[in-house]
Amino acid sequence: MGIKIGLVSLGCPKNLVDSEIMLGILKKAGYEITAREKEADVLIVNTCSFINDAKEESIRTIIELARNKINGRCRAILVAGCLAQRYPAELMAEMPEIDGLVGTGQVPEIARAVRRVLEGGKVLLTGSPGYLHDAYFPKVLATPPYTAYLKIAEGCDNRCSYCVIPAVRGPFRSRRMEDIMSEAEELANKGVKELIIVAQDTTRYGIDLYGKPMLDALLEGLTGIKGPVWLRLLYTYPSLITDDLIYLMAKSRKICRYLDIPFQHASNRVLQLMNRRGSKEEAARLVAKLRADIPGIVLRTTFIVGFPGETEEDFQELLDFMAEAKFDRAGVFTYSREEGTAAAEMPGQVPEEVKLLRRERAMMLQQEISLQKNLKRVGEVIEVLVEGKSLKGRGMYTGRSEGDAPGIDGKVFFKSGFNLQPGDFARVLIKGGTEYDLTGETVL
């Protein structure tokens, strides 16, 4: 019987791509991949450390998986990803459950790490995070077969005062356009219907290689690939959304009328403290332009509340902006004080209970906005990517519209007399809506 490897991927889709590459490398090296923890000889946790909640989830997962050393056949626990990159000494000193660490820059060395821990050694592979994968890296997709993430760059050159990403992921570095196209064509040949383009900052794509933003040129090339029906953009930085990109999105039916734009706040004073480029006024103009030039576009954003120095007036300014902009989707997070960041040392740290109350108030406002927007869609016929049968009843299915990214947005629950399969597209008449989801039935 061969050596079996299990992997748990935590955090964002960018981390999931690293997990897919690690699985591909291990499979190519002759290891068997298993989803059953108790069957694995080696268990890998690809961790996140972006905010405190993510760190706690990573540590909990490591402890839970380590129980398989007693109750299963597990011989070693490997920790990979951002937590390993950020806290190597602390993890090895304080968590004896861990047999090895693989940092964000050492993904290609995962097979060597597995080999070493199986021999009984301890492994510490953390160094400068300069790794950048290409189309030749083997991958095992961890997504449903009709959807895939396409990571076009690594690292980040933005220096937001609250963020550890540049420290754990390194400087921004783009993949070559022809290399991305090659991977996209391979995914299309495998039957992928939805390509989701990700990076720490997708709109910065190409600046380091070509001297200017090239996301629009990349997208134009991707629209020419036969196969994928939807191209979806995540993690766009507002100040780099160009007129050329907007024009391309408006004219191409392959690019989802959907943009994920983390504005983070609306008080210019707080934005300055966050070291974010742009202002509330520029954000408002961008939102208006996107809606005017791309009718029906769905806009998702994220905001941070309780940032150091945020006053009640600053927070009210954010609420007013949310009420005026009426984003289709919004995530609201409480500020997480991360050591090593400029914001962690700022005066005016906001008490935790105030942060939580502000988050609740912002989310209540957004839920009402989302509900009203969804109810206004009743009577529309939309295209839905079928994800499978729903447990809500006989003949019920679940899927997503072009306005719904997997894992972060809502669903469409619908009834159909057709025998639909995951990855099919269906035309659905919307008959109802909640804060997050739509309901309906298929039409011819």
From Swiss-Prot:
Source lineage: Bacteria, Bacillati, Bacillota, Clostridia, Eubacteriales
SUPFAM superfamilies according to UniProt: Radical SAM enzymes (SSF102114)
Cofactor note: Binds 2 [4Fe-4S] clusters. One cluster is coordinated with 3 cysteines and an exchangeable S-adenosyl-L-methionine.
Domain Radical SAM core: 142-372
EC number in record: 2.8.4.4
Protein name in UniProt: Ribosomal protein uS12 methylthiotransferase RimO
Chief localization: cytoplasm
Organism the protein comes from: Pelotomaculum thermopropionicum (strain DSM 13744 / JCM 10971 / SI)
Binding residues annotated for [4Fe-4S] cluster 2, in chain numbering: C156, C160, C163
Annotated function: Catalyzes the methylthiolation of an aspartic acid residue of ribosomal protein uS12.
Record-stated family: Belongs to the methylthiotransferase family. RimO subfamily.
Residue span, TRAM domain: 375-444
Residues where [4Fe-4S] cluster 1 binds: C12, C48, C82
